[in-house]
Curated annotation (Swiss-Prot):
Protein's name in the database: Small ribosomal subunit protein uS8
Molecular function as annotated in GO: rRNA binding; structural constituent of ribosome
Keywords: Ribonucleoprotein, Ribosomal protein, RNA-binding, rRNA-binding
Matches recorded under PANTHER family: 40S RIBOSOMAL PROTEIN S15A (PTHR11758)
Gene3D superfamilies named in the record: 3.30.1370.30, 3.30.1490.10
Subunit relationships: Part of the 30S ribosomal subunit. Contacts proteins S5 and S12.
Native species: Streptococcus agalactiae serotype V (strain ATCC BAA-611 / 2603 V/R)
Family: Belongs to the universal ribosomal protein uS8 family.
GO cellular component: ribonucleoprotein complex; ribosome
Length: 132
């Protein structure tokens, strides 16, 4: 089966595992998924990220994070720019997700950045997803 939107698939797998309160999630690896997973770890949405190399494409293992009473750290994930409708923004028009409580993941000329990092570096780009 041909996957037309691997980013949306990755976000959906995280959302589903999060709703089911799974501790670990494994997805087929790609550079963009590694970048998104690293941002999620850096911003504190997941505990840890491991990349397992094999002879094929590799696997990304994401360790989901939950609060003290089992509440989810990731409330929701939303794909913004899709293959059928790309969404680009300038640095001055960069969206704030829930007034800064969430993050936007932006693909820029300097790689994947959060909305805050893109604003600081004065770089626009393609808004891939919102996470809060």
């Amino acid at each position: 089966m041909v996957m037309t939107d691997p980013i949306a698939d990755f976000l959906t797998r995280i959302r589903n595992a999060n709703q089911a309160k799974h501790e670990v999630l494994e997805v087929p690896a790609s550079n963009i998924k590694k970048g998104i997973a690293d941002i999620l770890k850096r911003e504190g949405f997941v505990k840890n990220v491991e990349v397992i190399e094999d002879d094929k494409q590799g696997i990304i293992r994401v360790f989901l994070k939950y609060g003290q009473n089992g509440e989810r750290v990731i409330t929701n994930l939303k794909r913004i720019s899709k293959p059928g409708l790309r969404v680009y923004t300038k640095h001055e028009d960069m969206p704030k997700v829930l007034n800064g409580l969430g993050i936007a993941i932006v693909s820029t000329s300097e790689g994947l950045l959060t909305d805050k990092e893109a604003r600081q570096k004065n770089i626009g780009g393609e808004v891939l997803a919102y996470i809060w």
